[in-house]
Amino acid sequence: MQWALAVLLAFLSPASQKSSNLEGRTKSVIRQTGSSAEITCDLAEGSTGYIHWYLHQEGKAPQRLLYYDSYTSSVVLESGISPGKYDTYGSTRKNLRMILRNLIENDSGVYYCATWDG
Protein backbone atom coordinates (compact mmCIF):
# COMPACT_ATOMS: atom_id res chain seq x y z
CA MET A 1 0.00 0.00 0.00
CA GLN A 2 1.40 3.40 -0.96
CA TRP A 3 0.31 6.79 0.26
CA ALA A 4 1.67 10.31 -0.03
CA LEU A 5 3.30 12.55 2.52
CA ALA A 6 2.69 16.11 1.38
CA VAL A 7 5.61 18.23 2.41
CA LEU A 8 5.54 22.00 2.54
CA LEU A 9 8.40 23.97 3.98
CA ALA A 10 7.12 27.31 5.15
CA PHE A 11 8.31 30.17 7.28
CA LEU A 12 6.57 30.46 10.65
CA SER A 13 7.38 33.38 12.88
CA PRO A 14 5.80 34.21 16.23
CA ALA A 15 5.46 37.97 16.60
CA SER A 16 7.46 38.00 19.84
CA GLN A 17 10.54 36.35 18.37
CA LYS A 18 13.38 37.69 16.28
CA SER A 19 12.96 35.75 13.06
CA SER A 20 15.11 34.61 10.17
CA ASN A 21 13.93 34.05 6.62
CA LEU A 22 13.67 30.54 5.23
CA GLU A 23 13.86 29.50 1.63
CA GLY A 24 10.87 27.20 1.24
CA ARG A 25 10.03 24.65 -1.38
CA THR A 26 7.00 22.46 -1.80
CA LYS A 27 7.57 18.77 -2.28
CA SER A 28 5.35 15.73 -2.31
CA VAL A 29 6.85 12.46 -1.17
CA ILE A 30 5.31 9.04 -1.79
CA ARG A 31 6.63 6.14 0.27
CA GLN A 32 5.44 2.69 1.22
CA THR A 33 4.23 1.97 4.72
CA GLY A 34 7.17 0.88 6.87
CA SER A 35 9.76 2.78 4.83
CA SER A 36 11.50 6.10 5.59
CA ALA A 37 11.29 9.58 4.09
CA GLU A 38 13.65 12.54 4.23
CA ILE A 39 12.70 16.20 3.91
CA THR A 40 14.97 19.23 3.79
CA CYS A 41 14.59 22.66 5.34
CA ASP A 42 16.56 25.23 3.34
CA LEU A 43 17.79 28.03 5.59
CA ALA A 44 18.65 31.62 4.76
CA GLU A 45 22.35 32.48 4.94
CA GLY A 46 23.49 32.95 8.52
CA SER A 47 20.44 31.37 10.17
CA THR A 48 21.13 30.36 13.76
CA GLY A 49 19.16 29.52 16.83
CA TYR A 50 16.39 26.98 16.85
CA ILE A 51 14.96 25.11 13.88
CA HIS A 52 11.50 23.67 14.51
CA TRP A 53 9.62 20.95 12.62
CA TYR A 54 5.80 20.86 12.61
CA LEU A 55 3.21 18.46 11.22
CA HIS A 56 -0.18 19.78 10.10
CA GLN A 57 -2.89 17.25 9.36
CA GLU A 58 -6.30 18.09 7.94
CA GLY A 59 -8.78 19.11 10.62
CA LYS A 60 -6.11 19.40 13.33
CA ALA A 61 -3.93 22.17 14.71
CA PRO A 62 -0.25 22.07 13.68
CA GLN A 63 1.82 19.92 16.05
CA ARG A 64 5.46 20.67 16.83
CA LEU A 65 7.43 17.44 16.51
CA LEU A 66 10.90 18.55 17.51
CA TYR A 67 13.42 21.33 17.36
CA TYR A 68 17.13 21.45 16.65
CA ASP A 69 19.23 23.66 18.92
CA SER A 70 22.07 24.95 16.73
CA TYR A 71 23.92 26.32 19.76
CA THR A 72 24.33 22.87 21.34
CA SER A 73 23.83 20.73 18.19
CA SER A 74 21.08 18.80 19.94
CA VAL A 75 17.61 17.58 18.96
CA VAL A 76 14.74 18.02 21.43
CA LEU A 77 11.63 15.90 20.85
CA GLU A 78 8.21 17.11 21.94
CA SER A 79 6.49 15.18 24.72
CA GLY A 80 4.76 12.10 23.35
CA ILE A 81 7.02 11.79 20.30
CA SER A 82 8.65 8.36 20.10
CA PRO A 83 12.46 8.42 20.12
CA GLY A 84 13.73 7.10 16.81
CA LYS A 85 10.65 8.15 14.82
CA TYR A 86 12.14 11.49 13.73
CA ASP A 87 15.71 12.71 13.59
CA THR A 88 17.60 15.63 12.08
CA TYR A 89 21.04 15.90 10.57
CA GLY A 90 23.15 17.83 8.12
CA SER A 91 22.92 21.29 9.59
CA THR A 92 25.35 23.21 7.44
CA ARG A 93 23.87 26.64 8.14
CA LYS A 94 22.25 26.19 4.72
CA ASN A 95 19.90 23.28 5.39
CA LEU A 96 18.68 20.81 7.96
CA ARG A 97 17.23 17.44 7.04
CA MET A 98 14.60 15.53 8.95
CA ILE A 99 14.14 11.81 8.48
CA LEU A 100 10.84 10.08 9.26
CA ARG A 101 11.22 6.38 10.01
CA ASN A 102 8.82 3.43 9.89
CA LEU A 103 6.10 5.39 8.11
CA ILE A 104 2.45 4.73 8.83
CA GLU A 105 -0.62 6.19 7.14
CA ASN A 106 -1.09 8.62 10.05
CA ASP A 107 2.25 10.27 9.15
CA SER A 108 0.60 11.79 6.09
CA GLY A 109 0.28 15.57 6.27
CA VAL A 110 2.00 18.87 5.63
CA TYR A 111 5.39 19.31 7.31
CA TYR A 112 6.75 22.77 8.10
CA CYS A 113 10.09 24.02 9.31
CA ALA A 114 10.64 27.33 11.06
CA THR A 115 13.59 29.09 12.62
CA TRP A 116 14.14 31.93 15.04
CA ASP A 117 16.58 33.06 17.68
CA GLY A 118 15.26 32.62 21.12
Curated annotation (Swiss-Prot):
Compartment list: Cell membrane
Bridged cysteine pairs (disulfide): 41-113
Pfam families with a match to the protein in the record: V-set
Record flagged with keyword Disulfide bond: yes
Stretches that traverse the bilayer: none
Record-linked SUPFAM superfamilies: Immunoglobulin
Glycan-bearing residues: 106
One annotated Gene Ontology cellular component of this protein: external side of plasma membrane
Signal sequence coordinates: 1-17
Its job: V region of the variable domain of T cell receptor (TR) gamma chain that participates in the antigen recognition. Gamma-delta TRs recognize a variety of self and foreign non-peptide antigens frequently expressed at the epithelial boundaries between the host and external environment, including endogenous lipids presented by MH-like protein CD1D and phosphoantigens presented by butyrophilin-like molecule BTN3A1. Upon antigen recognition induces rapid, innate-like immune responses involved in pathogen clearance and tissue repair.
Subunit (UniProt): Gamma-delta TR is a heterodimer composed of a gamma and delta chain; disulfide-linked. The gamma-delta TR is associated with the transmembrane signaling CD3 coreceptor proteins following the stoichiometry: a single gamma-delta TR heterodimer associates with one CD3D-CD3E heterodimer, one CD3G-CD3E heterodimer and one CD247 homodimer forming a stable octameric structure. Upon activation, gamma-delta TR complex associates with FCER1G to initiate intracellular signaling.
Descriptive protein name: T cell receptor gamma variable 4
Name of the coding gene: TRGV4
